[in-house]
């Protein structure tokens, strides 16, 4: 499976277009099925950024909806949260996408954007906000207590 790695900065042109980094385009094309949009863009619920999902990953994200009663408030709320602000987007020949105005406003994008790889997905940020988020993530990740490979409880070697 192709993954999205690194942070890349590109200019947003006057028409609202931005070039997807080449490595990200390659990963998206490797995952896209014929006739599908290249990527699904949606506002993050947690951060002032745009989430970018390969179509198959977005479909997997929506699978929990299948477990809810289709006519319930919970289903309607989840469907609205997932789909109402989601935009399927294709790139032009130069690898550029057009960012919808509502998403640009959500992420406070003006003239430059930062593409931040997250493995299976990526995010699109205002560059200074992306740097702050990366610093915050590094700090918080140091506080996570992940079990070491090959170690027993108490820190003794296996």
UniProtKB/Swiss-Prot annotation:
Its main location: cytoplasm. One of its GO terms (molecular function) is transcription cis-regulatory region binding. The keyword Cytoplasm applies. InterPro entries: MraZ (IPR003444), MraZ_C (IPR035644), MraZ_dom (IPR020603), MraZ_N (IPR035642), MraZ_sf (IPR038619), SpoVT-AbrB_dom (IPR007159), SpoVT-AbrB_sf (IPR037914). The keyword tRNA processing does not apply. Residues 133-158 are annotated as: Disordered. NCBIfam families: PRK00326.2-4 (NF001477). This is Transcriptional regulator MraZ. It comes from Gluconacetobacter diazotrophicus (strain ATCC 49037 / DSM 5601 / CCUG 37298 / CIP 103539 / LMG 7603 / PAl5). The lineage of its organism: Bacteria, Pseudomonadati, Pseudomonadota, Alphaproteobacteria, Acetobacterales.
